[in-house]
Amino acid sequence: MLNLNLANLQFMAHKKGGGSTSNGRDSQAKRLGAKAADGQTVSGGSILYRQRGTKIYPGANVGRGGDDTLYAKVEGVVRFERKGRDKKQVSVYPIAK
């Protein structure tokens, strides 16, 4: 006598049993990148750049948060600048009144 339990056979099935997949998920976008443009006037505490790691370094009057977000410490004009040959920084220069 045949043991049919060994080989999960499906006789006379029009559609065979579908397997499962380990795909079908995706994480939400984190909305990283520049939040203020070069030359834009910002107030103190405004977020300038959201990033993972130090893609852009903080310059004058710019702070770095715990998640590497760059923010303005004072009200002023945003400037994206080079820092040496291979690095970039963002600074905020106060507006002269």
Swiss-Prot record:
GO CC terms in record: cytosolic large ribosomal subunit
GO biological process entries: translation
Classification of source organism: Bacteria, Bacillati, Bacillota, Bacilli, Lactobacillales
Propeptide: 1-12
Region annotated Disordered, chain positions: 15-37
Chain segments annotated as coiled-coil in the UniProt record: none
Source organism per UniProt: Streptococcus suis (strain 05ZYH33)
Pfam families the record matches: Ribosomal_L27 (PF01016)
Keywords: Ribonucleoprotein, Ribosomal protein
Family, per entry: Belongs to the bacterial ribosomal protein bL27 family.
InterPro entries documented for this protein: Ribosomal_bL27, Ribosomal_bL27_CS
MF term (GO), any: structural constituent of ribosome
Protein name as catalogued: Large ribosomal subunit protein bL27
Keyword Ribosomal protein among UniProt keywords: yes
